[in-house]
Regions:
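Hydrophobic transmembrane alpha-helices and immediately adjacent juxtamembrane helices
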Residues: 2-12, 19-336
Length: 336
């Protein structure tokens, strides 16, 4: 049995509330026959009155029958993590499936991973770089905006796919047991392929414009961890809400369009007043984008304050989001 623990109940014990007691049945017993299966409805005998679990336990012990005590397994945080580790093969399968489905029946396939960051970069360069003449920290605006788009598109696409993942896989939720967290997790991880393609394009642009990375590249692994944790946390929060309230799904595209202006994708952080900097830094993507720009393009010193505040925010978002998801996952099959 999935997610159930069973063991023999010792003599003179009483089963606590919320457990099931099966008298005279062990794991070696065959399934009982159903003699009334073909009996017409009108000829069925009157149902017997059943007592509470504790009384069933007492009656079973009085009749000297073996008693099996069945209770749900623990679903704590450590138990959930262990379940994810045990199902790592399933996670790999779901990630591969996400990637195949995304580009199935597509004329250019993985080419969309190239075009998706390229088109916004061209639009931002014309509107904000040429017309609005926003500052770009002394580097070409095309390179400046593309360096911000690469992590932002991973975040926005990962959140969008993660939010829609439970609804898209609703048929799986009621048919088989597995850690539900694997569904949004696979959607978020699968977007890392697109991120790698966009990063290769960014490196090519750096060579073209002569941008030289600095020692800050040593911080990039932590910046990527912040980006992934933030994406997973937001995806868990919103996917849990979306499967209960479909309004979240409809409002998501509008929300993503607004959020892009809360991060320094098209403008530098120097435009933000100092009195707003701490509040602004609560968005983890601010530290991620500015940190990557500093490390790869050498635009300015590493923004340690933004990274420190963003690190705390990303951890809070990830932990709270996954905890909320795990607490609510029992109702997914009912509301999907």
């Amino acid at each position: 049995m999935n997610n159930l623990d069973s063991f023999d109940l010792p003599p003179n014990a009483t089963a606590p509330p919320g457990t099931f007691v099966v008298a005279g049945l062990t794991s070696r017993d065959a399934a009982p026959e159903l003699p009334l299966a073909n009996t017409p409805l009108g000829e069925l005998p009157a149902p017997e009155r059943h007592s509470r679990p504790g009384n069933n336990c007492q009656a079973a012990m009085e009749s000297e029958l073996p008693v099996t005590w069945i209770q749900p397994s623990s679903v704590g945080r450590m138990s959930s993590l262990l379940e994810l580790v045990k199902h790592v093969d399933l996670l790999q399968f779901l990630v591969r499936r996400e990637i195949k489905v995304r580009y199935a029946q597509s004329a250019i396939g993985i080419g969309w991973a190239v075009l998706q960051p390229l088109f916004p970069m061209l639009i931002f360069t014309v509107i904000f770089g040429r017309l609005a003449k926003l500052s770009s920290d002394g580097i070409p605006y095309a390179l400046f905006s593309f360096a911000g788009l690469v992590p932002w598109l991973y975040f926005s696409n990962g959140v969008t796919d993660g939010v829609n993942s439970l609804i898209a896989n609703a048929n799986m939720l009621s048919k088989v047991y597995f850690p539900r967290l694997l569904i949004p997790l696979s959607a978020v991880i699968s977007r890392f392929i697109d991120f790698c393609v966009a990063t290769i394009m960014l490196l090519g642009m750096m060579v073209w414009y002569g941008a030289i990375p600095n020692w800050g590249v040593c911080v990039i692994p932590w910046l990527l961890a912040m980006m992934i944790l933030t994406t997973i946390g937001i995806a868990c929060w919103l996917s849990t809400l979306a499967i209960q309230y479909r309004d979240v799904k409809h409002a998501l595209s509008f929300l993503i369009q607004v959020l892009v202006y809360t991060a320094p994708v098209v403008y530098p952080t120097t435009l933000i007043p100092e009195s707003w900097k701490l509040l602004y830094a609560l968005n983890p993507m601010v530290g991620v984008i500015e940190g990557l720009r500093s490390a790869l393009l050498g635009t300015r010193d590493m923004p340690w304050l933004l990274i420190a505040i963003g690190s705390v925010s990303s951890l809070v978002i990830a932990i709270s989001g996954t905890n909320y998801f795990v607490r609510k996952q029992r109702i997914f099959a009912d509301v999907a």
